[in-house]
Amino acid sequence: MTATSERITVSMSEGVADVRLVRVDKMNALDAPMFNALVDTAERLRTEKGLRAVVLSGEGRAFCAGLDMGRFAAMNDGTSDLRDLAKRTHGLANHSQQAVWGWRQLPVPVIAAVHGVAFGGGFQLAIGADMRFLAPDTRMSVTEIKWGLVPDMAGTPILARLVRDDILRDLAFTGRIFSAQEAMSYGLATRICDDPRTEALAAAREIAGKNPDAIRGIKRMLNGLGGDPGPALLAESVEQMKVMGTPNQIEAVRANIEKRAPKFADGSN
């Protein structure tokens, strides 16, 4: 399989799919075409004959900077498309969740090669992989609270399996930026390496040389641990719908755009 779009390129070699985000001018930020490309690419790879492993990376200065700023501007001026996030369009997930969850559903291991920044949705995309190889200068953040939102894109059920509960709460409540070294200490980084893509491709080729039936069986077993993720995915959507478009959420966006401290009313939910 070789595929090229305005957002993602895919090349196959020796059973390894090299998937790259290529919206370089926007640090691979997530707009509607990028969401669609992530969902569609994962779906096509699920049935790719001979697939043994996947490496997911970003071209340019960053892995993925998160949600496109144009979407936050739409929240500010009231033109945001507030769809019914609770609608399950892809099994357990809605469309934006599937951009991450689809990589969890692949029957083969996925390695994220991360450099630069992985913020918000970009962070969720990274943790949607089975393993994460980080460059030493990588910075990460659960950024949603900065914009008055709750973590989404399947981040909460995945994070709950990866880190301690208090670490999860710290990152989600504060939205603070943390380093590759901190990510390693939290259990969010598999390796820290100078050239994460090269090392990830080497690891993927090593995996591709193992019994593919056993590899797929291992992933099925590990994905089955921890219970049904469906309720957590739905709760994530419901809570997001409660805050999107509210005065406090719009104030968070405006304050960030205007580079000032927000002025929130007392919480109502």
Kindly give the residue locations of the regions a language model identified:
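Glycine- (often His-adjacent) and acidic-residue-rich active-site loop
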Residues: 58-99, 118
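Terminal low-complexity tails and localization/encapsulation signals of metabolic enzymes
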Residues: 1-5, 254-269
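Conserved CoA-thioester-binding segment of acyl-CoA-metabolizing enzymes
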Residues: 1-59
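Acidic, divalent-metal-coordinating active-site segment for phosphoryl/phosphodiester hydrolysis
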Residues: 175-182
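C-terminal long alpha-helix characteristic of the crotonase
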Residues: 24, 133-138, 189-235, 241-247, ...
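CoA-thioester-processing core
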Residues: 98-107, 113, 119-173, 186, ...
